[in-house]
Each structure stands twice: as C-alpha cells, then as structure tokens.
Regions:
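Polar low-complexity intrinsically disordered regions
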Residues: 175-180, 184
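Domain-level recognition of nuclease-like catalytic cores that cleave nucleotide substrates
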Residues: 3, 101, 106-175
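Conserved small/polar residues in nucleotide/adenosyl-binding loops
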Residues: 193-200
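Acidic-basic catalytic patches of nuclease active cores, encompassing PD-(D/E)XK
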Residues: 1-53
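Active-site beta-strand-loop-beta-strand hairpin of nuclease catalytic cores
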Residues: 55-56, 60-72
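Residues immediately flanking
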Residues: 75
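Hydrophobic alpha-helical segments, chiefly the membrane-spanning helices
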Residues: 205-206
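Short, charged, amphipathic alpha-helix that recurs within catalytic cores of restriction-modification
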Residues: 78-117
Length: 206
C-alpha cells in the first residue's frame, strides 16, 4: 500500500488502541453523537499489532486483540467507493478466510474513503465458519463483503459499517453483539425505563 497506506494503518491503529488524540483526529468532522460512540474505545482499547507480510499470509495489516476478541484487519483506501479484488488482493482475501476458518477468528476489512467528511472508515467482515462466543455474536451485526453479479466479493464503502458504530458495538461493557441501532439513546432514558418497570413490579406485588 506504500507510505500512504501505512499512514492510514497508523491512523486506524491509533483509534483502535484507544488513543484520544487519534480518535479526535478521525472524528473531527463527525457529529457529536458519532464522536461519543467512537470515544468508547478509549475506555476499552485494543492491543493493536502491525502484522508482518502486509496481509499476504492471512494476518491482515493489523491484528487487534482484547480479551477473547481478535480481529485480523486488512486496511484498504481509495478515492472510489468501490474496490474490486483481483490478483494479490484476492489472494489476501482467501488467506484471511483460511486463517479465520482454521483459527476461529473474524477477519475484517477497514476501508478508508479519501476526501470525504465525517466518518471516512467503513468496516466489513469476511465470511468464515465456526465462530463461537463473542465473535459469533458480533459477527451477526457486522456487514459482509458484498458480492458482484458473478458472486465475487469486493469492497463497497456504502455497504460497510461506519467505524464509530463498529467501535460502539465492540466496546459495549457486556461484549454482546446486539445491533448498534438498538442501543438506548441516552443513559437517562435507560434509568427512567428501569425505574418505571421497577415501580410497576412493586405495584403488582402490593
């Protein structure tokens, strides 16, 4: 990917590692809600390792680890919303899938669209078999790489999960894979709802 690609790898690595400066940099043109969701990673950061071989052996460009969660991540960037995989890039995809199947990992693609305001990163998963635990639950909420009319996987920025939503998903305190769309809008709403439920149960007991 060259020096530009390496810069984007460092950008994503800084975010996943929970560095406040890095999160602020990628969310400076995002909404306050999006920024708040992304900032959750500062409380539950990943250990992020730059993988050797630039993803050619199924490790991806980055390896993000935390507890029982591990993501090999292949980083791509382009000025185009769609990126088709062929030759070496298709071999990288197949290697990621093979490692995911053999090791029970969930490989991801992180796609950076150049020249766009707001959240410029999108996350997509590589379809693998045999996932268990938290990875299996998380996998249900992360979109897969879309398919061409010939059934071949490719990258489509519009069909990926925004990075801030991904961070909010994987940084939930319980680690469950509930969709980000189902998150409560605010802590106050949750407290009020729980309080009303508690009051109702007391009335029923009485």
């Amino acid at each position: 990917m060259g020096s530009i690609g390496s810069a984007y790898e460092r950008e994503l690595r800084s975010v996943l590692a929970g560095e406040i400066k890095g999160v602020r940099a990628v969310t400076k043109s995002c909404s306050e809600i999006e920024r708040t969701q992304a900032m959750k990673v500062t409380n539950r950061p990943f250990l992020v390792v730059r993988a050797p071989g630039s993803g050619s052996e199924g490790t991806g460009d980055l390896l993000a680890l935390r507890g029982d969660i591990c993501f090999p991540i292949e980083v791509k960037s382009s000025k185009s919303k769609k990126l088709y995989l062929s030759g070496r890039t298709f071999d990288q995809l197949e290697a990621l899938r093979d490692v995911g199947n053999r090791c029970g990992l969930l490989p991801l693609y992180a796609y950076r669209l150049k020249g766009v305001r707001g959240d410029s990163w999108r996350i997509m998963k590589v379809e693998v078999k045999g996932l268990s635990g938290k990875l299996r639950h998380l996998s249900r909420s992360i979109p897969s790489l879309p398919l061409t009319r010939n059934g071949k996987e490719y990258l489509d920025w519009d069909k990926g999960m925004p990075l801030h939503r991904f961070l909010s998903l994987v940084c939930r305190s319980d680690g469950a894979g509930t969709s980000v769309d189902s998150f409560p809008s605010s802590p106050i709403t949750v407290s009020y709802t729980h309080l009303r439920a508690h009051e109702t149960s007391l009335h029923l007991v009485c």
